[in-house]
Design a protein with these regions (language model features):
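Short S/T/G/P-rich N-terminal loop/turn motif that feeds into the first structured element of a domain
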Residues: 1-53, 60-66, 70, 93-95
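C-terminal structural segments of small proteins and small subunits
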Residues: 62-90
Length: 95
C-alpha cells in the first residue's frame, strides 16, 4: 500500500544550508522508489500555523519510506535541514 512522506517548512533560518540540503536530499533518493508529488510549489494554509512550503513524496510502502528516511545519505542531508529551517515531517499510509 502506498505511503507518503510529508514535509512542511514552518520557518527558514539559513538559505545556504537549505540549498545544500535540497541538493543532497534529492540525490539521496537514488536507488529508492521515491516519487515527488509536490515540491515547494504554491502553498495556501487553510488551518493551523502558517506553512512556508511543503514537499510530498510517495513510496510503495511505509517500510520503503522509512528505509529512505533512515538511509545514511538522507540522514546527512537531514542535518543540513535542521540547520536551515524548522520543519514538521510525517509519514502516512495511503488508502
Amino acid at each position: 500500500m502506498a505511503a507518503y512522506l510529508v514535509f512542511t517548512k514552518e520557518r527558514e533560518h539559513d538559505a545556504g544550508a537549505m540549498k545544500e540540503y535540497s541538493a543532497k536530499a534529492g540525490a539521496s533518493t537514488a536507488g529508492h522508489a521515491a516519487k515527488p508529488l509536490a515540491y515547494y510549489g504554491a502553498i495556501e494554509t487553510l488551518e493551523g500555523p502558517e506553512a512556508q512550503a511543503s514537499v510530498i513524496l510517495e513510496f510503495p510502502t511505509m517500510e520503503e519510506a522509512r528505509a529512505w528516511y533512515q538511509s545514511d545519505a538522507y540522514q546527512e542531508a537531514r542535518a543540513l535541514r535542521f540547520q536551515g529551517g524548522d520543519y514538521r515531517v510525517f509519514l502516512t499510509q495511503g488508502v
